[in-house]
Amino acid sequence: MEKIFYVRRNEFENSLCAVRTILAKYFGIQNPVILRTENGKPYLKDNAVYFSVTHTKDALFLAFCDENVGIDAEHTEKDVDFLPIIKRFSALERKEIVDKQAFLRNFTAKESAVKWLGGTLARDFRKLQFINGKISYGEIELPTKTVFIPLDNYIVAVTSERDFSNVETIIL
């Protein structure tokens, strides 16, 4: 039941409107009660469907699953000087980050893992490592898979215990 939605920012008033519309239209959940964890992660009161949302300047990306999920996206043309940033990454990660695209894969993988954890960037991002396609929190490898989905000029990372390799992608 894994689904990814790609929505232009101007299609909905805000991301919560997009979530409510998608839940009603694609999952038959009318008037969902959406709560937030202490760290701000939105969730359904009855956990019938798990979801994660990420924003870019021009788009929303939403992941839905019957298990916990995290999503992040970045525009591949984003102008970013990644060399000063990766100085804070582990030596093994720095070896893998050979160009901007590798940096964006690493960054989106880790941010989607933070969302899967229900954590915060400030607390958890630096504790995560993305090496050889696997995410670790400190010394512990997470029981997740991170899949990258190219959509237009975006790199979209989805982290879940489910395999999103053959995910249905819906463009609204």
Question: Which residues fall in each region the model found?
Answer:
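Core catalytic alpha/beta fold that binds nucleotide/phospho-ligands
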Residues: 1-172
